[in-house]
């Protein structure tokens, strides 16, 4: 973890053949672009995080796919909401990132907490190594799946309890449709590698 070099750069220019694109922010680990961040202005009510996500999904992913070979995930924000998703993930599946015990805060504080939590080097590397999978969307296109925040938190708590030998090691309760199957996939994978 400490031996890696982490840099976040503004206006990252990437060229693929004749096409050149400029992303707002990119997190590089050892010079490799791992996280792309598209930040829209918070003062224009006509723009939202969705505009940034669509720019990533419909423009960057299609026109400079080489940039997304090492990509762990992308982020879109306009300073009021924060959403993340992985390559080819439809934007309607992009989700927020927040700690489960985090109370709702004013927008800019919530964005700051999400950035400070999700973009810590240990979290980015953990997401990259243990919390990604692949699936086929609508029977055609392969997409990269990345854990939602509750799957990330839940998996790490399950692993922590199993390693510590607590009773009811893997017991966790979630609502229907919350991604329990993926949580178990991530937990099994992480436990196997532990």
Regions found by a protein language model. Name each.
Residues 1-194:
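ATP-dependent helicase/translocase motor core
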